[in-house]
Curated annotation (Swiss-Prot):
Family per similarity comment: Belongs to the class-I aminoacyl-tRNA synthetase family. TyrS type 1 subfamily.
An annotated Gene Ontology molecular function: RNA binding
Annotated EC: 6.1.1.1
Matching Pfam families: SYY_C-terminal, tRNA-synt_1b
Native source species: Bradyrhizobium diazoefficiens (strain JCM 10833 / BCRC 13528 / IAM 13628 / NBRC 14792 / USDA 110)
Protein name in the entry: Tyrosine--tRNA ligase
PANTHER family: TYROSINE--TRNA LIGASE, MITOCHONDRIAL, TYROSYL-TRNA SYNTHETASE
Binding site for L-tyrosine: 39, 176, 180
Length: 417
């Protein structure tokens, strides 16, 4: 393990955040002086960011904790173009109104892990629409475009893989890397930002910005990326039967967030404690050393600390208590996630397969049938044995809900609206 001069790189290294860096020595010297102003860009493609974005948010958190300045760059401009990285087909074009709505929905989450203000290491939030939407086409081609080699652009994974598969790539997508590179140079001029961070899939785009800065006479710029986030079994992290693990509470409840971490594979507990909590490394070391059934206690700590960081300590403790009552006492907890269905549908008989799909506990009717055969689905704690069963008002508990369960740990309440 390399010993760095800066707290920033030492923290990232011991916690497992580092995948690639364009110049460790130069960045280390900059960070040691508290001059490593850095940014991460977040496109506004959805109403919420997801768990993959949370990883880079934690990098910004540790940057700030080590005395350097973080910038969160909202992609109001780049979202109009669409990042082709990791995509097999062109992204759907979003209207300006949709992008603005997404941006407003997203922006509040950053203050959960960053301190904003006017101080030397206080975070700032900018939007690349401020400069990208004002660019003159001819000036852009002459002043910026001439520094890009199409030969090199064709070797980037986001482009090369599409071409190898004979999948269409639009001209607007092809220009995404130009926009991202220009962002880096513009931020360097405006704020003195010298570091861009991102996921490993962004390495090529970030390096384009480093090179553009050199060609346009900007100070030396740096690139730093995180590893691809996967579980010990090799699966891409961040998906559940309900879909993506969103960061906004109205799209993925604190209880679901807590449960997501509680269900971590044994081999991943230590890694995720380092990446998604701020617990001291000494405490994480003790939790990593737990074995057998004791590893479940470490999972509860992971779930509570990760949830507290994003949703607050009260929400984390409430989620932990709800889980304890539900799983240890078998109680029907009112704070379980709830899905509403029209009262008329329930009165007419709501198919049990449809109910489990609508609740997000299974992905399809076929999966629901397979789980019923295996005894994995329950209604009000009673096993479902007939896939033609219909839920009705007769299934409502005294609390006016129907409890659906998948296995021992996944529960949803159905409530007539």
């Amino acid at each position: 393990m390399t010993a760095f001069k800066s707290d920033f790189l030492n923290i990232l290294q011991e916690r497992g955040f580092i995948h690639q860096c364009s110049d460790f020595e130069g960045l280390d010297a900059l960070a040691a002086k508290g001059e490593a102003t850095a940014y991460v860009g977040y496109d506004c493609t959805a109403r919420s960011l997801h768990i993959g974005n949370y990883l880079t948010m934690m990098m910004l958190h540790w940057l700030q904790q080590s005395g350097n300045k973080p910038i969160t760059l909202m992609g109001g401009g780049t979202t109009m173009v669409g990042d082709p990285s990791g995509k097999d087909e062109t992204r759907a074009m979003r209207t300006v109104a949709e992008i603005e709505a997404n941006k407003e929905s997203i922006r509040g989450v950053f203050a959960k892990v960053l301190r904003y203000g006017d101080g030397k290491s206080d975070a700032v939030m900018l939007d690349n629409a401020e400069w990208l939407t004002k660019l003159n086409w001819i000036e852009m081609l002459r002043d910026v475009g001439r520094h890009f080699s199409v030969n090199r652009m064709l070797t980037m994974d986001s482009v090369r893989l599409r071409l190898e598969r004979e999948q269409e790539m639009s001209f607007i997508e092809f220009n995404y890397m130009v926009c991202q590179a220009y962002d880096f140079v513009e931020l360097a001029k405006r704020t003195g930002c010298k570091l861009q961070m991102g996921g490993s899939d962004q390495w090529g785009n970030i390096i384009m910005g480093v090179d553009l800065g050199r060609r346009m006479g900007t100070h030396q710029l740096f690139a730093l990326t995180t590893p691809l986030l996967t579980t010990a079994s090799g699966a891409k992290m961040g998906k559940t039967a309900q879909g993506a693990v969103w960061l906004n509470a109205d799209q993925f409840s604190p209880y679901d967030f807590w449960q997501y971490w509680r269900n971590t594979e044994d081999a991943d507990v230590g890694k995720f404690l380092k990446l998604f909590t701020t617990l001291p490394m000494s405490e994480i070391g003790k939790l990593e050393a737990l074995g057998g059934s004791e590893i479940n206690e470490a999972k509860k700590v992971l779930a509570t600390e990760a949830t507290a960081l994003l949703h607050g300590r009260d929400a984390a403790n409430e989620a932990a208590e709800t889980a304890r009552r539900t799983f240890e006492e078998g109680a029907l907890a009112e704070s379980l996630p709830t899905v509403e269905i029209p009262r008329g549908e329930l009165d007419a008989g709501f198919g049990v397969l449809n109910a489990f799909v609508k609740a997000g506990l299974v992905a399809s009717n076929g999966e629901a049938r397979r789980q019923i055969k295996g005894g994995g689905l329950r209604v009000n704690d009673e096993p479902v044995t007939d896939d033609k069963m219909a839920l009705s008002a007769a299934h409502l508990t005294p609390e006016g809900v129907i409890k659906l369960s998948f296995g021992k740990k996944k529960h949803i309440l159905i409530k007539p609206a």
